[in-house]
A protein has these predicted regions:
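Glycine-rich phosphate-binding loops that contact phosphosugars or nucleotide phosphates
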Residues: 42-191
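A general structural motif
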Residues: 78-79, 198-207
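Cofactor-/ligand-binding subdomain signature composed of acidic, glycine-rich
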Residues: 1-44, 166-202
Length: 212
């Protein structure tokens, strides 16, 4: 669709907006998920992701990063299924929701259900500062992707991934994991908008060799 193509090309700016003000010279900055978040992260032992649709897939990608970068186990659940479980919450578990709108009914219900459990804290990655998810979570990172009209998610997904990378780096920093790796990741993340932009410039060349 027209909107989908438009939003694909908005990805470099969207990702730049997500990471803006979050990175220092060679590491992620402290407390970018809210006041006191770095202290909370120093007590994390595992993470529970809950989301729906595209956001769930972002969480599944993020799981690999958290295990590799922060060295902590992660679990990813459909919000619609999680809210009907009786989860055994282990000590030091951070509950993380991911949502573009921050109003996804099942994800919001899962957060409210989780608030009755003994989680270390709740955190959301979402795109809308005025959303219920943002208001009701203890910590939050706004992706600042701007409105997404296209049905197929584009910039919302890539900015969620950028937000998850920032979270993985932040937790790794609080847990004092692999400073050299964090430095490399900070440099790579800082260059990502330009890399995406250069990739999108290849679209015309690619269209010549891809059958329509």
């Amino acid at each position: 669709s027209h909107f989908m193509e438009k939003e694909i090309y908005e990805q470099p700016v969207a990702v730049a907006n997500t990471i803006y003000g979050k990175l220092g010279e060679d590491d992620v900055l402290d407390n970018i998920f809210g006041l006191g978040s770095s202290e909370v992260f120093s007590n994390i032992k595992r993470i529970q992701f809950v989301a729906c649709g595209t956001s769930l897939h972002a969480g599944k990608v993020g799981r690999f990063w958290f295990e590799q970068i922060a060295k902590i186990p992660c679990y990813v659940d459909f919000a619609s299924e999680y809210r009907y479980r009786e989860p055994l919450v282990e000590e030091g578990t951070l509950f993380v929701t991911i949502s573009q709108s921050g109003e996804t009914a099942d994800t919001l219900a899962a957060l409210r259900y989780a608030q009755e459990k003994d989680y270390l804290s709740t955190l959301s990655i979402c795109n809308v500062p005025t959303s219920s998810l943002a208001r009701e979570s203890e910590h939050v990172l706004f992706t600042n992707a701007g409105p997404e009209i296209g049905v197929a998610s584009t910039k919302a997904f890539t900015t969620q991934l950028a937000g998850l990378m920032l979270l993985a780096m932040s937790i790794a920093k609080s847990l004092e994991e692999d400073k050299d790796l964090r430095k490399n990741l900070a440099n790579e993340l800082r260059s990502l908008p330009e890399v995406i932009s250069e990739t999108l410039k290849l679209s015309e060349d690619i269209s010549k060799i891809v059958p329509t």
